[in-house]
Amino acid sequence: MSGGKQHNAVSIPVNREQRSFEKQRRDLLTGLEHGGGAHRGNSIAPYTEDWPSTVDNWIDSSWKRWDDDMRRLRRGMFALLPLDTFSIGILENPFALMHQMDRQIQDIRERMGSLDVPSTGSVNDFLKDAYEVGEDGKVHFKVRFDAQGFAPQDINVTSSENRVTVHAKKETTTDGRKCSREFCRMVQLPKSIDDSQLKCRMTDDGVLMLEAPVKVDQNQSLTLNESGQVAVRPKSDNQIKAVPASQALVAKGVHGLSYVDDGSGGKRLHVEVAVDPVYKPEDLFVNVDSNRVVVSGRHHKQKSDQHGRSSSFAEFSQSYAIPETVDPLSVSAQVVGNTLVLEAPLEKQHAITH
């Protein structure tokens, strides 16, 4: 036996939900709306001081865009693919299998010319929407699989080495003869989640939901943008003082996108954006949208004097195309003088040769 580190697969029980996916979603929003979650407490203060109001706004927006959100969530579900379409050599290499699965779904989408075909599930496609408020009012990692036609006992879910595998077996009987087919899907897990707490549920209309809490640095400030995506706020002056010098970001004086060495043979994304002094750290947001990193700011100021009340509003948004995406929760951002500096490790794509 090899002396290398072994990555044993951990089985994740599939629990049956006695409700539909839509009902589960409604119950989530209603529970948070009625104060059932912990987002009003002090247990998640490290996110931001205004996190409770951020969650309240997200709940209101989710109700208003209900139909659009349900379509988006269903389009983003992972499809289970038949294993008999893949070669044995591919099956023995998990990263090659994930790559091949992505290509197969993309080919189907291109042939059909439809966005209604389930997402490729590649890093570029799903991480931007993989974080959402959970029942406890905190940010959770959530992915969903279209498992219609399967029962919970037909599905085996395992996690190993930063990936999760959904394996399903389906038996049919035609003219007295039994036929069995196996389906599978692998998804690479981001390092920002607590994979020891992965939970799996299956709704009564065939949606398999995988969920886990996230690990957030105590000095990291999370918020939600207008689309409900998780965004990172730059560290405040007090937070920067608490950061070790080795982790402090440095402005290089080159505005825009560049790359820096990460010290271990890889590359980190480095972006510098000049910001007007009117913007404070709490006015700025960084989020990831597919293969783009987006920096935006919004400042609203009200003033009262003997002539009455007046208000001013300023905003900006800049985006930068990147060759590979990043995990939104891996972004580190600081304001250095009048420059917003952000860095994040690139999600490594495993090259496949053919």
Curated annotation (Swiss-Prot):
Region (Disordered): 1-21
sHSP domain span: 122-233, 251-354
GO terms for biological process, alphabetical: protein refolding; response to heat
GO cellular component: cytoplasm; nucleus
Protein keywords: Repeat
GO molecular function: unfolded protein binding
Keyword Zinc: no
Cross-referenced InterPro entries: A-crystallin/Hsp20_dom, Alpha-crystallin/sHSP_animal, HSP20-like_chaperone
Matching PANTHER family: HEAT SHOCK PROTEIN HSP-12.2-RELATED, RE23625P
Entry's family note: Belongs to the small heat shock protein (HSP20) family.
Name of the protein: Major egg antigen
Organism of derivation: Schistosoma mansoni (Blood fluke)
